[in-house]
Amino acid sequence: MSKDSLTALVWFRQDLRTEDHIGLKKALDSGLKVIAYYTFNPRHYQNLSWGFKKTDRFRAHFLVQSVRELKESLKSMNISLIIDSKPPEIGIIEYLKKYQVRQIYLQHEWTEEEKKEEQAIAKKIDTSIKWYRHYDQFLFHPNDLVFSRDQIPEIFGIFRKKCE
């Protein structure tokens, strides 16, 4: 397989921007063809056990606008954005195969739902596909904290003073 036929995929989830996006920059630096993926995950639009949706109409409208802007921004970089409406552990698998994806770039998430999605995908794909996760959503990188995760203050003012 020639390097020209191999692809890097940037998986957009909560990080719908192109400026200062570490994963996107690293994918572009990889030398592989780059495509992007976003799904309007149907689970986000279902009623939760608390009786409301994780994503209701105002947030959905905002997401549609954000994804539209992301698509235009990526287009100006000559990158196609695949917009899907399947759960990622189903939808993304199809595109990994179709585009011979060898590298996946994504924001490192820590919540249970995102971790389960990643684990479900990892179980279904070729182990030669490399995952590149990055922290891109914090004021402070977790490795730069001067205390352990279980010692993080619950009040931001105290947290800030410990970090200064």
Where does each model-flagged region fall?
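Trp/Phe/Arg-rich N-terminal binding region typifying the photolyase-homology
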Residues: M1-E164
